[in-house]
Regions:
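Asp/Glu-centered strand-loop micro-motifs enriched in Gly/Pro and often flanked by an aromatic residue
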Residues: 9-30, 60
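General secondary-structure edge motif
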Residues: 9, 18-19, 52, 62, ...
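Active-site-adjacent bridging/hinge elements
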Residues: 6-14, 50, 76, 172-175, ...
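Iron-sulfur cluster-binding electron-transfer modules in prokaryotic oxidoreductases
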Residues: 19, 93-408
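Short acidic/polar alpha-helix capping motifs at helix-coil junctions
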Residues: 32-35, 45, 162-167
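Non-heme iron-sulfur electron-transfer modules
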Residues: 1-14, 37-71, 85-114, 399-404
Length: 408
């Protein structure tokens, strides 16, 4: 990731050093502009620097810098476009990592207003609030309405979704255990996806085991600059994952955005000497299913004859992995798959803050436009939050691929 984004550096949270690095990266982006059409961050960056003398990013005011940084919602599209990611140390650019450092600096040096800090903290804890039982869940819902304009879509199904028994006994004779990390997003907003995952795994002889400490990957705290809390979550999760490895259990992470955070940031922010080995053991559901006996030979996975095709929405976050495995699993199960790539809409509820409403709404509209002309074909996406937002926009259900595989 580069020494400039190494949190153990003494000047990592220093305002002058951080703003100097932000200006350097902005200058590189201004001269490059290959990411101009990826999201609204870069048009604002270019417009702001255009108004500076000699187009010098160092002349941006702190407020202008902060406004550009706060607009980023970690979709990671810029990383795949950037020709400077692999440049030598001191010249490399990693915009998402810069945003993490800049936001951490703002929080550490008390540049956030009380309203901003409260809003960020509520968003970071929203999944926890929505996991509460009534009547406390009602209080969590009111907090969510206060901090995001997308609350109606997120809360739409909460009254109809009941706590479901997610324990499923394996349906085959040979049984082995898998450590399943559903993530707080699935727990709070899409528990049916967790149930579907365990139903599908049961069909290949895998019994899902969930540790008591498995809840959140820490992404909301990382993205809002709460590095201290993020480190605690990383330490707890790495400890739990290491125990699973010692018991010989594969580790499956339910959401692509959470898996991305673990692979990209855990080694950087963890002091555990085993963290690199732990990260190497993390899998998404498709890596796991691809490794077991092919499900194509199991009639429980076969498609329904009346609906043989589906559209797979693939976010920019998910596409940074081996993006062929999900498609391969679906095709082995008999589906004809059409992949439509798109910019990541929201991997955590934190990304739905009011200051990012226009950006997220624009992405939802863009993805909806890509789906024009899609008739009765099943539409699936790995991102549970994206599914909720698109379901409200399209007035048709967008499901998780595992829900499709789990259907009888």
């Amino acid at each position: 990731m580069g020494t400039s984004y190494e949190p153990r550096r003494a000047d990592y949270l220093d305002e002058m050093a951080t703003r100097h690095e932000t200006a350097r990266v902005f200058d590189v982006c201004m001269s490059c502009q290959k990411c101009l059409n990826t999201c609204s961050v870069f048009p604002l960056l270019v417009t702001s620097i255009d108004n500076c003398v000699d187009r010098d990013a160092a002349l941006l005011t702190p407020t202008q810098q902060d406004d550009i940084v706060q607009l980023c919602h970690q979709c990671t599209q810029c990383v795949s476009h950037c020709p400077h990611v692999d440049a030598p140390a001191g010249e490399a650019v990693n915009f998402p990592a810069l945003v993490v450092r800049h936001r951490a600096m703002l929080r550490k040096n008390s540049f956030l207003t009380l309203r901003q800090q409260t809003t960020e903290d509520v968003l970071a804890r929203s999944a926890t609030h929505m996991s509460w039982s009534q009547p406390f869940r009602f209080f969590g819902a009111q907090l969510l309405r206060y901090v995001t304009d997308h609350a109606p879509a997120l809360l739409l199904r909460l009254h109809s979704v009941q706590k479901q028994d997610s324990s499923r006994r394996a349906l085959t004779g040979e049984v082995y255990e898998v450590s399943y990390f559903p993530t707080c997003v699935i727990d709070a907003y899409a528990p049916e996806v967790g149930v579907a995952t365990q139903q599908v795994f049961a069909r290949v002889g895998a019994q899902c085991v969930r540790g008591k400490e498995h809840n959140c990957c820490g992404a909301p705290d990382l993205y809002n600059g709460n590095i201290k809390r993020f480190r605690r979550i990383v330490a707890r999760n790495v400890r739990a994952f290491r125990a699973s490895i010692e018991h010989g259990r594969p580790i499956v992470v339910g959401q692509p955005g959470c898996l991305h955070v673990m692979r990209e940031h855990y080694a950087t922010f963890s002091d555990d000497p085993s963290v690199v080995d732990v990260i190497a053991h993390l899998q998404d559901p498709w890596q796991f299913l691809a490794q077991v006996e092919t499900p194509a030979g199991n009639t429980a996975f076969q498609r329904q004859p009346h609906n043989s095709s589906l559209v797979l929405l693939q976010s920019s976050t998910a596409s940074r992995r081996d993006d062929t495995q999900l498609r391969d699993v679906l095709e082995k199960c008999g589906w004809d798959v059409q992949v439509i790539p798109h910019g990541s809409v929201a991997e955590t509820v934190w990304g739905l803050g009011k200051e990012r409403t226009d950006e997220v709404s624009g992405l939802i509209t863009e993805v909806s436009g890509l789906l024009e002309g899609i008739g009765g074909t099943e539409i699936v996406s790995e991102s549970c939050l994206t599914n909720l937002l698109l379901t409200g926009q399209l007035h048709r259900q967008v499901r998780h691929p595992l829900e499709v595989l789990a259907q009888p």
